[in-house]
UniProtKB/Swiss-Prot annotation:
It is an enzyme of class 1 (oxidoreductase). The keyword Amino-acid biosynthesis applies. Keywords: Amino-acid biosynthesis, Cytoplasm, NADP, Oxidoreductase, Proline biosynthesis. It is found in: Cytoplasm. Gene3D superfamilies: Aldehyde Dehydrogenase, Chain A, domain 1, Aldehyde Dehydrogenase, Chain A, domain 2. This is Gamma-glutamyl phosphate reductase.
Amino acid sequence: MAEDIKSKVIQAKKASIELSSVSTEVKNLALEAMAQALDKERKAILDANAKDLEAAAELKKKGKLTQALVDRLKVSDSKIDGMIAGIRDVIKLKDPVGDTLSTLELDKDLILYQVSCPIGLIGVIFESRPDVVPQVMSLCLKSGNATIFKGGSEARESNRTIFQILVKAIESTDGMPAGAFQLMETREEIMDLLSLDAYVDLLIPRGSNEFVKFIQENTKISVLGHTSGICHIYVDEYVDLDTAWKVCFDAKVQYPAVCNAIETLLINRKIADTFLPKMAEMYLSAGVELRCDEDSYALLEKRGLSPLSRATEEDWSLEYNDLILSIKLVDTIKEAIDHINTFGSHHTDGIITEDASRRKAFTALVDSSSVMVNASTRFADGYRYGKGAEVGISTNKIHSRGPVGMEGLLIYKYILLGKGQVVADYAGENAKPYTHRKLDLKFEDVN
């Protein structure tokens, strides 16, 4: 392991202790400095991104980079506006550090507080998306977490430029510790980072299925993330057709390269003849490749719609991240739910229905981190969920699930305030009893 890698991590770990106690006022000043710096340095960011895009175009020609990754790589003025708005949204969020989550009296003058605190040092490993840097850095800063960033080599110039702009703004703010945010740039550094479980408290990988699986399988550090976004919409027989056409179109076409776009459309057989032909026309006019099961293929072929492809069994398990959609007809809502729970990735799935009992069954039985009713799966996003931004989407069955904002970057500690009590007084034949009484007290109010 290169010593400079370990020294960066150790420096960030030390800075994480200081960062955990920085005041809300100072953190917000640093965040505003970040926003202003991005606005001021637009040209530098766009110039750096242009270099990455030029190199990416060559890699795409050689088949080494997909169009989906190229799309995620591109930075524009409007994307910079989004970065700035995202940071300022985080400023508006309540500082979650030091919140009293519960208070319990164990006995008179022996009070136990459960208080929120930062995780510590977080490693964020991501592919192709330079906007991850300001998005995650702002959330980690506000929640008091030091962060190591490792972006994909295809975004090296963009990541480096944005990172340097932001860190300069942060470290020029009085009261902010130096070294809390670090950047790694080579592929070899990933393996070094994965081995530093003595210092790094959490890893958040953002990228392809294979990429996230690789991270999970090669580290002892806890990993927050999802391996893929195989999302579905089920169109029920009790449906408002205009709603179904609009929502299903948006869920695939609005931005197909992201993990909350649908990959499979399930349609109740009783509504297929009425719903599917127009839906297919809309998709085909938008350039979507349709991979149909036997029944949907026969229905659309009979209507003279083309081009069509036949779905294979493999298609039900594929995340396309592109203008490709699998279509399957089902007999019942149970069949749809079983298909989703078998082939889905527990990310985001939806139902279009006007029937309350179908809605309740679907939301109860679909095992996904977000379940949509008569709304696009594309809403599964930290910003849209009012979190300011997100560090990632988790399909893990832990405390943080779905789009993870600042609340997923916090843990808690127990603080016990006493007046000389000892356990011996609460043991043995004449043991004092515990009161175990819940109190409405805040640790921050204690003198």
